[in-house]
Design a protein with these regions (language model features):
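Enzymes that bind and transform nitrogen-containing heteroaromatic metabolites
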Residues: 3, 7-237
Length: 237
């Protein structure tokens, strides 16, 4: 006789939430991760790090819970970011990487190309530039052409394509501009927000309005030791 489980423990709660979301909507569950200063700035002028080492290590653990990370060519070009798991015991070829690059502006000399030989990397574009498409394909990047990526309908088609490729849990790591777009389209479920205890003032800025940050609600602080930093999980309105 099979015993019916009445309660799901906290360890598996997120998994089951995404499972039921996938089953109901035939779409991947989309969450986001963002780092901000005490005065709610997301970019530091002379460094790409806003939060401390402990926060970044926990960020790698969060990444490991997702099938893929979505970022934009703008964010990757700015930080030369790998967007993988880089702490001992985790697979540094995971999660898979999805790059949104409408006009194929991704730089040709980036660290992620070295990992693309073994790591699944997808690039979604609306460009017809065959020369650049050939270049990226030679770098072992799977280029997928979209007719358009500007409306909610377009983005739902994009997410359904990722679902078809087997992606069930997706983490967004990008700038405020892109997050504002997805928030307005109501395509993000939860947000992990790492908050520094340091005000950046004139040494920091935002590249877009803080609409995304203002859209967050039901903040819950996660009990993890990040020294002076704090980690919150919130839902998007």
């Amino acid at each position: 006789k099979i015993k019916r489980v009445k309660k799901i423990d906290n360890k598996n709660k997120d998994f089951y939430k995404s499972y039921f979301f996938n089953k109901k909507n035939k779409l991947p569950l989309v969450d986001a991760k963002i780092a901000i200063s005490k005065d709610f700035l997301t970019i530091k002028k002379k460094s790409k790090w806003i939060t401390n080492t402990r926060s970044r290590n926990v960020g790698h653990l969060i990444r490991s819970k997702y099938d893929c990370i979505i970022s934009t060519s703008t964010s990757i070009n700015s930080d030369n970011s790998l967007l993988n798991c880089r702490i001992k015991g985790l697979n540094n070829l995971k999660p898979d990487l999805v790059i949104i690059d409408r006009k194929l502006k991704l730089k040709k000399k980036l660290s992620l190309f070295a990992l693309a030989k073994k790591r699944k990397t997808f690039l979604f574009t609306t460009s017809n530039n065959s020369k650049k498409i050939t270049f990226f394909r030679k770098k072992n990047i799977k280029v997928i052409k979209l007719n358009s990526l500007s409306t909610r309908k377009n983005f739902l088609f994009f997410l359904k394509e990722l679902f078809r490729l087997g992606k069930r849990r997706i983490l967004i790591e990008a700038g405020l501009t892109f997050l504002n777009v997805l928030s307005k389209m109501r395509l993000i479920n939860n947000v992990y927000m790492f908050k520094s205890d340091v005000k950046l003032g004139s040494s920091g800025f935002n590249n877009s309005k803080k609409n995304f940050i203002k859209s967050l609600k039901n903040f819950k602080q996660i009990n993890v030791n990040l020294n002076t930093d704090k980690l919150f999980k919130a839902r998007v309105r």
